[in-house]
Amino acid sequence: MYWNHVLTVLEILLFAVSILQFMPYVDIVHTVLLILWILIACAYVVTAFVLAWMSTFHKDSLKKNTEHKASHRLEPIEDCIPVLSAVLGLITSVRHLRHSSSLPETTDIAIVYNFLDKHHFVVILIGILGWFVLQIGFALIYERVDRESGCKELSFPETEHPTRVEYFYHSITIGTTFAVSDVDANTSHIRWLIMLHSILAFIYNTVAVAAVVDMISSGV
């Protein structure tokens, strides 16, 4: 239960930093926000995967916690937070690629940042972490929707009581292949959600590939 609250707090922080990056600031503030976004996203991804791993040992507590969350009217809005954060992160990485600026190398942090920025490691990190945040966000949506229906929306082979691992597997499979693999989608509702996920994943992957091509063509 405690770790789920931590994940929620990280979602909110990540979304807040994502929004703040679009405000007009001096370069140093933008740099701090970029670093914050990367650190929070790392913490979010690691925490989410740890929770998924823990769910295989605490199935009952996971089910109880998910059902409790599903009763909250704001849950659908909360579901959108990591997805929006991932999209805003991708937009930020593209903007940073186009309008990157170096910091005065007066501190060790500035020197390290300029080195990473020069080789576009910052953009690459944001892109990769944003992709994981997007897939995790949809995995949590699949989990909530499926458990609200009594696990009737999705059918996992030889798995009577799916854990969070199953939903992560389903989401990441769609994010990489745009297909549901061996998971059955049983209702129109979940098929609409899968279709939306596939479209967003396709757009995200296309923009990410375009950014990589742009970096290569620029001589990076």
Predicted feature residues:
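The first (N-terminal) embedded transmembrane alpha-helix
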Residues: 2-25, 87
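Alpha-helical transmembrane segments
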Residues: 22-47, 118-134
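Membrane-water interface of transmembrane alpha-helices
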Residues: 45-61, 136-148
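Membrane-helix interface/capping segments
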Residues: 48-74, 94-108
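Alpha-helical transmembrane segments and their membrane-interface junctions
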Residues: 85-108, 174-189
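Transmembrane alpha-helix/helix-exit interface in multi-pass inner-membrane proteins
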Residues: 96-101, 129-151
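Membrane-proximal soluble regions of multi-pass membrane proteins
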Residues: 146-188
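Pore domain of cation channels
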Residues: 166, 170, 185-220
